[in-house]
């Protein structure tokens, strides 16, 4: 699966505000992957439609060096998901999933990064996972 990603306006604004002398937000205790039937656009989730029903919940994981590798490369520098992230098994249809986002909370919260991928229908009993190495965050 090819995953296209970007950083949210929240993260972009935090970076720019850091240059103004403001404190960068603290690292959250957990990060949360969310799935969307209508993907976030331009780092804003106002038009996005997050999956609901069928036992859906955001997938939590700890931000650490196991789950994300150190940035590497140049133009763009990137950090690659280093551990599989498996969502709870759906008990009903999640619809056609076309995007993802990473948040700092299990519901609502601040979007940190987002992306799109080839849409896939997710039904009851399907396995939904991001495999190690298949999600890359890049800074150009």
Walk through the language-model features, giving the residues of each.
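Small cysteine-rich, disulfide-bonded extracellular modules of the LU/uPAR three-finger superfamily
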Residues: 1-100, 104-140
């Amino acid at each position: 699966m090819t995953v296209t990603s970007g950083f949210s306006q929240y993260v972009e604004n935090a970076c720019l505000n850091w240059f103004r002398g403001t404190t960068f937000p603290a690292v959250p205790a957990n990060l949360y992957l969310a799935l969307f039937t209508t993907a976030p656009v331009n780092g804003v989730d106002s038009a996005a439609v997050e999956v609901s029903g069928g036992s859906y919940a955001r997938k939590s994981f700890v931000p650490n060096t196991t789950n994300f590798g150190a940035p590497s490369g140049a133009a763009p520098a990137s950090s690659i998901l280093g551990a599989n992230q498996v969502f709870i098994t759906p008990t009903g249809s999640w619809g056609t999933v076309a995007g993802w986002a990473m948040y700092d909370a299990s519901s609502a919260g601040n979007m940190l990064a987002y992306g799109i991928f080839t849409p896939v229908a997710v039904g009851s009993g399907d396995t939904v996972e991001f495999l190690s190495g298949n999600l890359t965050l890049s800074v150009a």
